[in-house]
C-alpha cells in the first residue's frame, strides 16, 4: 500500500523486512498484534475490536467517517466480482447486498456502505439456486450476516461463504 514494493530495473521487488510475520487471516493478525506490544498489522475497519487499537495516520483516526471522506489514507474497498455467466440467484444476492437493506447490514457491522442513495431490495420472483461466495477473511463476517438476512427473504436460495485470505486473489 505504501512503498512496500520498489522498482528495481524492470521488476517490482517486495521490500517487506525478512523479520516480518506474515499471516493469512484477520483473526491471526489480531491475535498476533494483541500479544506483542511492538507489533503492527492491518485489518479491515469492520474487524476492529477492543483487543487492538487503530493507528492514527497523519493524526487522523480510523473511523467510518474519516475513511468515507478520504481523510484516513489507508483504505481499500471490498469488491464483488462475478462471472460472465452469473446465475439469477447470484444476481439477486448481489442486488440484495447493494440495496439499502444490504447496505444497512454493512454499516451496522462497522464496515463502510457503498451508496447512501441505495434503494430498498425488491425480491425477484422464482429465484433459486446455489451461490458460492469466496473471499478474504476480512469480508467473511459481514458476508455471513448478509447471507443470513438474504436467506430470510429468499428461502429458495442457498448461499455458501468460503473464507480465504487477501493474498489468494481472484481467478
Describe the role of every protein-language-model region.
Residues 1-171:
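Exported/periplasmic ABC-transporter solute-binding proteins
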Amino acid at each position: 500500500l505504501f512503498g512496500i514494493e520498489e522498482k528495481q530495473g524492470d521488476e517490482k521487488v517486495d521490500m517487506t523486512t525478512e523479520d516480518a510475520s506474515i499471516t493469512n487471516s484477520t483473526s491471526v493478525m489480531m491475535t498476533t498484534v494483541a500479544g506483542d506490544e511492538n507489533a503492527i498489522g492491518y485489518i479491515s475497519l469492520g474487524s476492529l475490536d477492543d483487543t487492538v487499537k487503530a493507528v492514527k495516520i497523519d493524526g487522523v483516526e480510523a473511523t467510518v467517517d474519516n475513511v468515507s471522506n478520504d481523510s484516513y489514507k489507508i483504505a481499500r474497498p471490498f469488491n464483488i466480482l462475478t462471472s460472465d455467466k452469473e446465475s439469477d440467484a447470484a444476481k439477486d444476492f448481489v442486488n440484495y447486498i447493494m440495496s439499502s437493506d444490504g447496505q444497512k447490514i454493512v454499516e451496522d457491522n462497522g464496515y463502510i456502505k457503498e451508496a447512501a442513495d441505495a434503494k430498498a431490495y425488491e425480491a425477484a420472483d422464482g429465484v433459486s439456486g446455489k451461490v458460492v461466495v469466496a473471499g478474504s477473511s476480512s469480508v467473511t463476517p459481514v458476508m455471513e450476516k448478509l447471507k443470513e438476512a438474504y436467506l430470510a427473504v429468499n428461502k429458495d436460495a442457498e448461499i455458501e461463504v468460503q473464507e480465504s485470505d487477501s493474498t489468494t486473489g481472484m481467478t
